[in-house]
Amino acid sequence: MGEKMQGFQGWSIGIRFLTSCVSIASLILLLKSKQTVQVSVGLDYVTQQVKYSDTSAFVYLVFSDILVAVYCIVVLVGLIPAALGKSHPGKAGQWAIFIFDQVLAYVLLAAASSATEVAYLADKGMAKTSWEAVCPRFAHFCHTVMASISLSFVAVLLLALLAVVSASGLFGRFYRRPLFAVKMRHNTLI
Protein backbone atom coordinates (compact mmCIF):
# COMPACT_ATOMS: atom_id res chain seq x y z
CA MET A 1 0.00 0.00 0.00
CA GLY A 2 2.95 2.33 0.60
CA GLU A 3 4.01 2.22 -3.05
CA LYS A 4 0.44 2.85 -4.15
CA MET A 5 0.17 5.92 -1.88
CA GLN A 6 3.50 7.25 -3.13
CA GLY A 7 2.20 6.70 -6.67
CA PHE A 8 -0.87 8.80 -5.88
CA GLN A 9 1.34 11.45 -4.29
CA GLY A 10 3.58 11.49 -7.37
CA TRP A 11 0.62 11.88 -9.71
CA SER A 12 -0.85 14.54 -7.48
CA ILE A 13 2.40 16.50 -7.35
CA GLY A 14 2.87 16.33 -11.12
CA ILE A 15 -0.70 17.36 -11.93
CA ARG A 16 -0.65 20.14 -9.32
CA PHE A 17 2.57 21.53 -10.77
CA LEU A 18 1.07 21.44 -14.27
CA THR A 19 -2.16 23.04 -13.03
CA SER A 20 -0.30 25.88 -11.34
CA CYS A 21 1.78 26.48 -14.51
CA VAL A 22 -1.33 26.53 -16.71
CA SER A 23 -3.15 28.88 -14.32
CA ILE A 24 -0.16 31.22 -14.17
CA ALA A 25 0.12 31.22 -17.97
CA SER A 26 -3.60 32.04 -18.25
CA LEU A 27 -3.18 34.78 -15.66
CA ILE A 28 -0.21 36.34 -17.47
CA LEU A 29 -2.03 36.32 -20.80
CA LEU A 30 -5.09 37.94 -19.29
CA LEU A 31 -3.10 40.58 -17.42
CA LYS A 32 -1.21 41.45 -20.61
CA SER A 33 -4.37 41.66 -22.72
CA LYS A 34 -4.65 45.31 -23.63
CA GLN A 35 -4.97 47.03 -27.00
CA THR A 36 -5.24 50.63 -28.16
CA VAL A 37 -6.57 51.59 -31.59
CA GLN A 38 -7.38 54.82 -33.36
CA VAL A 39 -10.80 55.00 -34.93
CA SER A 40 -11.72 57.49 -37.60
CA VAL A 41 -14.70 59.67 -36.62
CA GLY A 42 -15.49 62.12 -39.37
CA LEU A 43 -12.30 64.05 -40.08
CA ASP A 44 -10.71 63.26 -36.72
CA TYR A 45 -9.32 60.18 -34.99
CA VAL A 46 -10.42 58.93 -31.59
CA THR A 47 -8.19 56.68 -29.51
CA GLN A 48 -9.94 53.68 -27.95
CA GLN A 49 -8.41 51.29 -25.48
CA VAL A 50 -9.65 47.96 -24.18
CA LYS A 51 -8.16 45.93 -21.31
CA TYR A 52 -9.16 43.00 -19.15
CA SER A 53 -10.22 45.18 -16.21
CA ASP A 54 -13.02 46.75 -18.29
CA THR A 55 -15.14 43.65 -17.72
CA SER A 56 -15.96 42.10 -14.36
CA ALA A 57 -15.96 38.58 -15.85
CA PHE A 58 -12.29 38.95 -16.80
CA VAL A 59 -11.45 40.34 -13.35
CA TYR A 60 -13.22 37.32 -11.82
CA LEU A 61 -11.12 35.04 -14.04
CA VAL A 62 -7.92 36.81 -12.93
CA PHE A 63 -8.73 36.28 -9.25
CA SER A 64 -9.80 32.68 -9.88
CA ASP A 65 -6.54 31.94 -11.70
CA ILE A 66 -4.57 33.49 -8.84
CA LEU A 67 -6.52 31.44 -6.29
CA VAL A 68 -5.97 28.17 -8.18
CA ALA A 69 -2.26 28.82 -8.73
CA VAL A 70 -1.61 29.74 -5.09
CA TYR A 71 -3.66 26.79 -3.81
CA CYS A 72 -1.84 24.31 -6.06
CA ILE A 73 1.56 25.65 -5.04
CA VAL A 74 0.71 25.54 -1.32
CA VAL A 75 -0.59 21.97 -1.54
CA LEU A 76 2.35 21.02 -3.75
CA VAL A 77 4.80 22.22 -1.10
CA GLY A 78 2.84 20.33 1.54
CA LEU A 79 2.83 17.08 -0.46
CA ILE A 80 6.55 16.97 -1.22
CA PRO A 81 7.46 15.49 2.21
CA ALA A 82 4.69 12.92 1.76
CA ALA A 83 6.11 11.89 -1.61
CA LEU A 84 9.53 11.46 -0.01
CA GLY A 85 7.97 9.17 2.60
CA LYS A 86 8.64 11.48 5.55
CA SER A 87 5.06 12.26 6.51
CA HIS A 88 1.58 11.81 5.14
CA PRO A 89 -1.37 14.15 5.47
CA GLY A 90 -3.91 12.83 7.93
CA LYS A 91 -7.53 12.08 7.26
CA ALA A 92 -8.61 15.70 7.83
CA GLY A 93 -5.87 16.99 5.53
CA GLN A 94 -6.81 14.56 2.77
CA TRP A 95 -10.48 15.51 3.13
CA ALA A 96 -9.55 19.21 2.89
CA ILE A 97 -7.50 18.60 -0.26
CA PHE A 98 -10.31 16.53 -1.78
CA ILE A 99 -12.94 19.20 -1.06
CA PHE A 100 -10.81 22.18 -2.13
CA ASP A 101 -9.84 20.45 -5.39
CA GLN A 102 -13.52 20.20 -6.26
CA VAL A 103 -14.51 23.66 -5.02
CA LEU A 104 -11.72 25.36 -6.95
CA ALA A 105 -12.57 23.36 -10.07
CA TYR A 106 -16.12 24.72 -9.86
CA VAL A 107 -14.97 28.28 -9.12
CA LEU A 108 -12.59 28.27 -12.08
CA LEU A 109 -15.23 26.67 -14.30
CA ALA A 110 -17.69 29.44 -13.41
CA ALA A 111 -15.08 32.14 -14.04
CA ALA A 112 -13.98 30.67 -17.37
CA SER A 113 -17.59 30.21 -18.47
CA SER A 114 -18.56 33.79 -17.68
CA ALA A 115 -15.43 35.06 -19.43
CA THR A 116 -16.31 32.90 -22.44
CA GLU A 117 -19.75 34.53 -22.64
CA VAL A 118 -18.21 38.01 -22.55
CA ALA A 119 -15.66 37.02 -25.20
CA TYR A 120 -18.45 35.59 -27.36
CA LEU A 121 -20.40 38.85 -27.12
CA ALA A 122 -17.24 40.79 -27.93
CA ASP A 123 -16.69 38.62 -30.99
CA LYS A 124 -20.26 38.33 -32.32
CA GLY A 125 -22.12 41.21 -30.72
CA MET A 126 -25.85 41.08 -30.08
CA ALA A 127 -28.14 42.70 -32.60
CA LYS A 128 -31.24 42.65 -30.37
CA THR A 129 -29.58 44.91 -27.81
CA SER A 130 -27.52 46.92 -30.32
CA TRP A 131 -24.25 45.62 -28.86
CA GLU A 132 -21.73 45.72 -31.63
CA ALA A 133 -18.87 43.28 -32.03
CA VAL A 134 -15.59 44.78 -30.88
CA CYS A 135 -13.25 41.98 -31.93
CA PRO A 136 -12.96 43.22 -35.52
CA ARG A 137 -11.33 46.38 -34.11
CA PHE A 138 -9.51 44.75 -31.19
CA ALA A 139 -8.40 41.46 -32.74
CA HIS A 140 -5.17 41.12 -30.74
CA PHE A 141 -7.04 41.66 -27.46
CA CYS A 142 -9.70 39.10 -28.36
CA HIS A 143 -7.15 36.47 -29.42
CA THR A 144 -5.16 36.95 -26.22
CA VAL A 145 -8.28 36.70 -24.07
CA MET A 146 -9.45 33.56 -25.86
CA ALA A 147 -6.03 31.94 -25.35
CA SER A 148 -6.25 32.78 -21.65
CA ILE A 149 -9.77 31.37 -21.38
CA SER A 150 -8.70 28.19 -23.17
CA LEU A 151 -5.86 27.71 -20.69
CA SER A 152 -8.32 28.24 -17.85
CA PHE A 153 -10.50 25.42 -19.19
CA VAL A 154 -7.40 23.20 -19.36
CA ALA A 155 -6.78 24.07 -15.70
CA VAL A 156 -10.40 23.11 -14.91
CA LEU A 157 -9.85 19.69 -16.49
CA LEU A 158 -6.63 19.27 -14.53
CA LEU A 159 -8.43 20.22 -11.30
CA ALA A 160 -11.13 17.66 -12.07
CA LEU A 161 -8.41 15.06 -12.58
CA LEU A 162 -6.85 16.15 -9.28
CA ALA A 163 -10.20 15.63 -7.57
CA VAL A 164 -10.26 12.05 -8.88
CA VAL A 165 -6.67 11.44 -7.78
CA SER A 166 -7.26 12.93 -4.33
CA ALA A 167 -10.48 10.92 -3.95
CA SER A 168 -8.61 7.74 -4.85
CA GLY A 169 -5.91 8.57 -2.33
CA LEU A 170 -8.40 9.47 0.39
CA PHE A 171 -10.78 6.57 -0.01
CA GLY A 172 -8.02 4.10 -0.82
CA ARG A 173 -6.10 4.96 2.33
CA PHE A 174 -8.78 5.55 4.94
CA TYR A 175 -11.90 3.78 3.72
CA ARG A 176 -10.62 0.58 2.18
CA ARG A 177 -12.76 -2.50 2.34
CA PRO A 178 -11.84 -5.79 0.81
CA LEU A 179 -13.94 -6.65 -2.19
CA PHE A 180 -16.53 -9.32 -1.44
CA ALA A 181 -15.66 -9.29 2.27
CA VAL A 182 -19.16 -10.28 3.29
CA LYS A 183 -20.17 -13.79 2.38
CA MET A 184 -23.58 -13.94 0.89
CA ARG A 185 -26.04 -16.36 2.35
CA HIS A 186 -28.36 -18.16 0.11
CA ASN A 187 -31.12 -20.59 0.67
CA THR A 188 -31.60 -23.57 -1.46
CA LEU A 189 -35.07 -24.67 -2.25
CA ILE A 190 -35.32 -28.36 -1.70
Curated annotation (Swiss-Prot):
Residues 1-10, 81-94, 166-190 are cytoplasmic. InterPro entries: CASP/CASPL (IPR006459), CASP_dom (IPR006702). One of its GO terms (cellular component) is plasma membrane. The chain crosses the membrane at residues 11-31, 60-80, 95-115, 145-165. It comes from the Eukaryota. It holds the Pfam family CASP_dom. Residues 32-59, 116-144 are extracellular. It is a multi-pass membrane protein. Keywords: Cell membrane, Membrane, Transmembrane, Transmembrane helix. It is found in: Cell membrane. Homodimer and heterodimers. Belongs to the Casparian strip membrane proteins (CASP) family. This is CASP-like protein 2U2. It comes from Pteridium aquilinum subsp. aquilinum. The lineage of its organism: Eukaryota, Viridiplantae, Streptophyta, Embryophyta, Tracheophyta.
